[in-house]
């Protein structure tokens, strides 16, 4: 039978519930338990796919094509289990499901209410995602006290009651702020947060107390007394310079022991040696590179969370510190790309919309002409294709129909029909809904022998997608004749997956239509990013040799 650990948050949002839950899951997995994580989001959107990155941050895509919360990216980076659609659901999905059942008459004429119908549906979703695992950690989004979170907290309380003794544990993450004017940590917000949770009928088994410093024993004793939580279960979680230190921090204070005792589990001792090695590699690099990332969401770096982590993972596996500088593509559009000359490599990530796109195109051209390593992801590949078509292949009016619906030379265009991850044919047009109508999830394709892509991936590549627009096959022949290499295509539609420049022309210039960052983990890194960082190191050293 699956055991449950519910992770809640109090006082303020963005305390790091996802990191805390993923870190605890990593410790439990190291103890030999089969572990998964679920994220319950209390917003009414069906999924985050149509939400602005400024509102929500990154949208993480699973192997089976779900557009999910960025916390699922943390989950995959901390444990070995792959996330699926069932690992993330929202208030919107719950209500949509209940209303469909009501319309079909499944409630037999009863008045449909939050309790029991909504809360039962939430529990059904939780059980579905947890099936087949020893322990499921369930992160409840939002903050205790928010009206949106109440049905999820009530469902967690009911599930705990129904599951019986030793079947569920509650871990509450809260803030202990430091008041500089008073020169002390303040525990009152935590006391009130726990009190609010207990009013709902939930008594936490452990408190994770976030602060900018370690919390002294006397303050932990005070929190214990007023929150009715054992003193050894009041865990101090202070700011760390890398999230990969958190598993060791929680283990050193016995959080996994407390949870295992509550759940009546007796697994083998934890082995966190892998995390120790990762942290050592991060803290003891032998070299460094600086990457210029040209995007439109640079004011909120959460929009590129998986990408940032993927670059850091590549740094771990190349013994290098990867410094990332975020550059606004609109500023480059206005002032020119000369500011990119100082970087060891240039990366243009995915994105949507016309704003700042000419700055990205200019960045791709600068990287190509200056022989600076370039990686274009999704839109980053498309702008590189547009630039090459305009400036090399003679298609001077080349553009994407995303930016100019009436362009005379649509080298990038809307996909009307494609196969999803399980082979089902999907169709859309310009009038289709925005939500859930993209090419989503993992797909496999063959790689052209003798290319840089083949050197990186081998003969085959499986990566995750999230896009509506593709390179237009009608124009690819012209661009290939001008020297660009299409080094991977989809097997059915022959859509461009990877493009590159010959190494006789440029040392490392690659564009990919998919999102490789979603598959990178600190354990293994990702071959594309590792190759990219190696190219950046080579460019840096070549520049130093010339001086």
From Swiss-Prot:
Entry keyword RNA-binding: no
Metabolic or biological pathway, per its Swiss-Prot or TrEMBL entry: Pyrimidine metabolism; CTP biosynthesis via de novo pathway; CTP from UDP: step 2/2
A GO biological process held by the record: pyrimidine nucleobase biosynthetic process
Record keywords, A-Z: ATP-binding, Glutamine amidotransferase, Ligase, Magnesium, Metal-binding, Nucleotide-binding, Pyrimidine biosynthesis
Residues bound to UTP: 13, 186-191, 222
Protein name per the record: CTP synthase
Function: Catalyzes the ATP-dependent amination of UTP to CTP with either L-glutamine or ammonia as the source of nitrogen. Regulates intracellular CTP levels through interactions with the four ribonucleotide triphosphates.
Active-site residues per Swiss-Prot or TrEMBL entry: 378, 515, 517
Keyword Cell membrane annotated: no
Catalysed reactions, as listed in the record: UTP + L-glutamine + ATP + H2O = CTP + L-glutamate + ADP + phosphate + 2 H(+); L-glutamine + H2O = L-glutamate + NH4(+); UTP + NH4(+) + ATP = CTP + ADP + phosphate + 2 H(+)
Binding locations of L-glutamine: 351, 379-382, 402, 468
Binding partners and assembly: Homotetramer.
Entry's family note: Belongs to the CTP synthase family.
Residues the record lists as binding ATP: 14-19, 71
InterPro entries referenced in this protein's UniProt entry, alphabetically: Class_I_gatase-like, CTP_synthase, CTP_synthase_N, GATASE, GATase1_CTP_Synthase, P-loop_NTPase
Enzyme's top EC category: ligase
Residues reported to bind CTP: 13, 146-148, 186-191, 222
Cellular component GO terms held in the UniProt record: cytosol
Leftover remarks: CTPSs have evolved a hybrid strategy for distinguishing between UTP and CTP. The overlapping regions of the product feedback inhibitory and substrate sites recognize a common feature in both compounds, the triphosphate moiety. To differentiate isosteric substrate and product pyrimidine rings, an additional pocket far from the expected kinase/ligase catalytic site, specifically recognizes the cytosine and ribose portions of the product inhibitor.
Domain (Glutamine amidotransferase type-1): residue spans on this chain: 290-542
Molecular function, one GO term: ATP binding
Binding site for Mg(2+): 71, 139
SUPFAM superfamilies assigned: Class I glutamine amidotransferase-like, P-loop containing nucleoside triphosphate hydrolases
NCBIfam families documented for this protein: PRK05380.1, PyrG
Stretches for region Amidoligase domain: 1-265
């Amino acid at each position: 039978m699956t055991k449950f650990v519910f992770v809640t948050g109090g006082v303020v949002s963005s305390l790091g519930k996802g990191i805390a839950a993923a870190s605890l899951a990593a410790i439990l997995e190291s103890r030999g338990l089969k572990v998964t994580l679920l994220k319950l989001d209390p917003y009414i959107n069906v999924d985050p796919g149509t939400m602005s990155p400024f509102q929500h941050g990154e949208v993480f895509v699973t192997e089976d094509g779900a557009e999910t919360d960025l916390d699922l990216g943390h989950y995959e980076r901390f444990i070995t289990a792959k996330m699926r659609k069932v690992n993330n659901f929202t208030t919107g999905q719950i209500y949509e499901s209940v209303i469909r059942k009501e319309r079909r008459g499944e409630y037999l004429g009863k008045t449909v209410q939050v309790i029991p119908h909504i809360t039962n549906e939430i529990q059904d979703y939780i059980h579905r995602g947890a099936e087949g695992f020893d322990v499921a950690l369930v992160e409840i989004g939002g903050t205790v006290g928010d009206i949106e979170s109440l049905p999820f907290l009530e469902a967690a309380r009911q599930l705990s009651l129904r599951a019986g003794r030793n079947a569920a544990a509650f871990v509450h993450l809260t803030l202990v702020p430091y008041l500089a004017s008073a020169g002390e940590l303040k525990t009152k917000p935590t006391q009130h947060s726990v009190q609010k949770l207990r009013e709902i009928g939930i008594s936490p088994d452990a408190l994770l107390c976030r602060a900018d410093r370690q919390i002294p024993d006397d303050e932990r004793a005070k929190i214990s007394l007023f929150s009715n939580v054992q003193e050894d279960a009041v865990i101090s979680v202070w700011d760390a310079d890398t999230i990969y230190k958190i598993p060791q921090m929680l283990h050193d204070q016995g959080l996994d022991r407390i949870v295992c005792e509550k759940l009546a589990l007796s697994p083998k001792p934890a082995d966190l040696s892998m995390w120790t090695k990762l942290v050592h590699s991060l803290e003891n690099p032998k070299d460094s590179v600086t990457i210029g990332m040209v995007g439109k969401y640079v004011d909120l770096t959460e929009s590129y969370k998986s990408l940032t982590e993927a670059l850091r993972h590549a740094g771990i596996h190349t013994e290098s510190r990867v410094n990332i500088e975020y550059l606004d593509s609109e500023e480059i559009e206005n002032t020119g790309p000369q500011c990119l000359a100082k970087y060891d490599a240039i990366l243009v990530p995915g994105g949507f919309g016309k704003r700042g796109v000419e700055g990205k195109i200019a960045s791709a051209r600068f990287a190509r002409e200056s022989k600076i390593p370039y990686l274009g992801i999704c839109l980053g590949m498309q702008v590189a294709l547009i630039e090459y078509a305009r400036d090399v292949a003679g298609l001077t009016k080349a553009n994407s129909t995303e930016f100019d619906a009436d362009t005379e030379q649509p080298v990038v265009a809307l996909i009307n029909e494609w196969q999803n991850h399980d082979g089902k044919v999907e169709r859309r047009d310009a009038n289709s809904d925005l939500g859930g109508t993209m090419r989503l999830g993992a797909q496999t394709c063959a790689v052209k022998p003798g290319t840089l892509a083949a050197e990186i991936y081998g003969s085959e590549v499986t990566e995750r997608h999230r896009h509506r627009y593709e390179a237009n096959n009608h124009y690819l022949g012209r661009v290939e004749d001008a020297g660009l290499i299409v080094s991977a295509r989809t097997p059915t539609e022959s859509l461009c997956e990877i493009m590159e420049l010959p190494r006789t022309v440029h040392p490392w210039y690659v564009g990919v239509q998919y999102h490789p960052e979603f598959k990178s983990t600190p354990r293994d890194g990702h071959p594309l990013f590792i190759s990219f960082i190696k190219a950046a190191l080579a460019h840096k050293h070549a520049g130093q040799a010339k001086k």
